[in-house]
Structure formats: structure tokens, C-alpha cells
């Protein structure tokens, strides 16, 4: 029992350290070639007169920005200049979440969700609910998030781990190579797969997987 409790603690730490910060920010097709502005021109306009940028350029500016302050400025500009577009709220929420402001992130994700209830806004709200311990609500959001990629499987696996459904967690994690996947395999008693998973990832953190 003590070992199980320690393993659960490791799973929660992995949730905080790895899954939650990696929110599904909305992806854009780069349209710079079409609109004729270089990255430098877009970032310069963001700094000096963001109102001249299209919504795609504004969100793109956040994607290419090198620092978080500029990213936040881009998404704030998107919300101000294009208040009906969900992407600014979504990405601004992601920045708040990564900064540890879960409440602020949830408010922005809710606004994004009202603008457009799509798989990504559902997924992000699911992550917030998972972080807040509202597992049933998180599962409802995840159920409407099909199409966001492997992160959905990871999030569902962590949810199953929290519920003690280790076999279900291992079954849904698929071929994902991450510290979280390693935890799932350890808790399911599959140490060989856990080891191969750790070996395959770029930045393995074995400490997360050796708490028992």
C-alpha cells in the first residue's frame, strides 16, 4: 500500500511537470508567404502597431516570439483586435496556465470555448478540471476532444491512473514515449516496457519513475 501511495504521488508530479504545461495551443497554417510579410515585419508591427496585423499574423507572432512576454502581448492583441476569434483567448489561457495561474487560464479557456466549442477548447478545459481534481468533468471534456493528438491519450491515462485503472491507462497510452507513459507502465507492472519507454524519450526523468 505504501508503495502504491508513493507511485500515485509520482504520477501526480508527472501530471504537474509534463502533461499540464503542454497544452494544445491552436495550430495555424503559416500564411506569411500569402500576406507578404516577413517574421521580422510581423514582430515589428506587433511591437509598434498591432492593429495593422491580421488575426492570423497576430497569432503567428505569438508562435514565433522568442520570449513569453512577447507571446502574451501577441495573444492580448488578438483578443483586443479580434474579440470574436477563439484562438487569442485559447493561447493566452495556455500562457497563464504555464505560468501557474490556473484560475486565470480557466477564465480565458471558458471564453475561447464560448467563441468556439472545438476539440482543442474542450481539451484545455479538461486539463484545467483535471488539475482542479474534478475528474468526472475532465472526462466529459476529454470525451469531446477527439482529434487533438497523443496528448489526449496521455491525459486520459493520467485520469485512469488517478482512478486506479492501471490496465485501462496502459491500454490507452499507445506508443507515446514520455515520462508519464513510463509511470503508467510501471503502475501496470510492465517494467520492461517502462524501461524501453524511458530509453526512447529525449529527456527521461527516472526520478519520477522510481518512487517506490
What residue spans do the PLM features occupy?
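N-terminal targeting segments with Sec-dependent signals, encompassing both cleavable signal peptides
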Residues: 1-211
Amino acid at each position: 500500500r505504501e508503495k502504491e501511495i508513493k507511485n500515485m504521488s509520482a504520477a501526480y508530479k508527472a501530471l504537474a511537470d509534463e502533461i499540464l504545461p503542454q497544452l494544445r495551443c491552436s495550430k495555424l497554417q503559416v500564411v506569411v508567404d500569402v500576406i507578404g510579410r516577413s517574421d521580422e515585419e510581423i514582430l515589428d508591427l506587433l511591437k509598434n502597431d498591432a492593429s495593422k496585423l491580421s488575426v492570423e499574423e497576430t497569432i503567428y507572432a505569438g508562435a514565433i516570439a522568442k520570449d513569453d512576454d512577447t507571446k502574451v502581448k501577441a495573444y492580448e492583441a488578438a483578443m483586443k483586435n479580434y474579440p470574436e476569434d477563439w484562438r487569442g483567448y485559447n493561447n493566452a489561457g495556455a500562457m497563464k496556465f504555464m505560468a501557474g495561474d490556473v484560475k486565470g487560464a480557466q477564465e480565458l479557456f471558458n471564453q475561447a470555448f464560448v467563441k468556439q466549442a472545438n476539440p482543442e477548447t474542450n481539451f484545455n478545459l479538461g486539463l484545467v478540471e483535471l488539475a482542479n481534481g474534478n475528474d468526472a468533468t475532465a472526462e466529459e471534456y476529454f470525451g469531446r476532444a477527439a482529434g487533438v493528438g497523443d496528448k489526449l491519450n496521455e491525459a486520459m491515462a493520467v485520469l485512469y491512473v488517478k482512478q486506479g485503472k492501471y490496465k485501462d491507462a496502459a491500454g490507452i497510452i499507445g506508443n507515446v514515449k514520455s515520462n508519464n507513459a513510463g509511470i503508467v507502465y510501471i503502475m501496470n507492472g510492465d517494467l520492461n516496457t517502462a524501461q524501453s519507454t524511458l530509453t526512447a524519450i529525449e529527456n527521461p526523468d527516472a526520478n519520477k519513475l522510481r518512487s517506490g
